[in-house]
From Swiss-Prot:
One of its GO terms (biological process) is rRNA processing. The gene is rimM. This is Ribosome maturation factor RimM. One of its GO terms (cellular component) is cytoplasm. It comes from Clostridium perfringens (strain 13 / Type A). Binds ribosomal protein uS19. An accessory protein needed during the final step in the assembly of 30S ribosomal subunit, possibly for assembly of the head region. Essential for efficient processing of 16S rRNA. May be needed both before and after RbfA during the maturation of 16S rRNA. It has affinity for free ribosomal 30S subunits but not for 70S ribosomes. The PRC barrel domain binds ribosomal protein uS19. The keyword Chaperone applies. The keyword Cytoplasm applies. Keywords: Chaperone, Cytoplasm, Ribosome biogenesis, rRNA processing. Pfam families: PRC, RimM.
Length: 165
């Protein structure tokens, strides 16, 4: 498992005093209220201020005090240590932990490995890459078991839930 988790990406500057506009990459963007620090380019940096504007976070970090300094950080990812992550509910997983898991069905057919998780308003979708790409809706009647120790996800056979043209 990864020790660091990505929580956002700096997408622009905000104002002249080093504040930055951040695209949150976490389900609950209000989690920034509780961060004492973030990891920026491998270094721990204290969070001095957090504001919200529409669907973005305005972040002020210690040591970044001008628009010029903030400008250099555009497109940089913000990370936190796993121990500072929010506590997950049962049957919830961080995307970074699901990526690379092998997906098989109850008949033993191997579809491939999870390349990414697509988040949609109704449910997540596993993007599985093997001999061909398959999109697997993350629904209780399709995804039957997730074994993180073995990095193995068991689903119902695709013929039972996937329709072909």
């Amino acid at each position: 498992m990864e020790d660091l988790l990505v929580v956002g990406q700096i997408i622009n500057t905000h104002g002249l005093r080093g504040e930055m506009k951040v695209m949150p990459l976490t389900e609950d963007m209000r989690r920034f209220d509780y961060l004492e620090y973030v990891i920026l380019k491998g270094k721990k940096v204290k969070v001095e201020g957090v504001k919200y504007f529409k669907d973005k976070v305005i972040l002020k970090l210690e040591g970044i005090n001008s628009i010029e300094e903030a400008e250099k950080l555009k497109r940089t990812y913000l990370e936190i240590e796993r121990e500072d992550a929010i506590e997950l509910e049962e049957d919830e997983y961080f995307i970074v932990d699901l990526v690379g898991c092998t997906v098989v069905d109850t008949e033993g057919f191997e579809y491939g490995k999870i390349k990414d998780v697509i988040q949609t308003p109704s449910n997540d979708v596993y993007w599985v890459q093997g001999k061909k790409e398959v999109l697997v809706p993350v629904l209780k009647d399709i995804v039957l078991d997730i074994n993180m120790d073995e990095k193995l996800i068991t689903i119902r056979p695709s013929g039972e839930w996937q329709y072909e043209d």
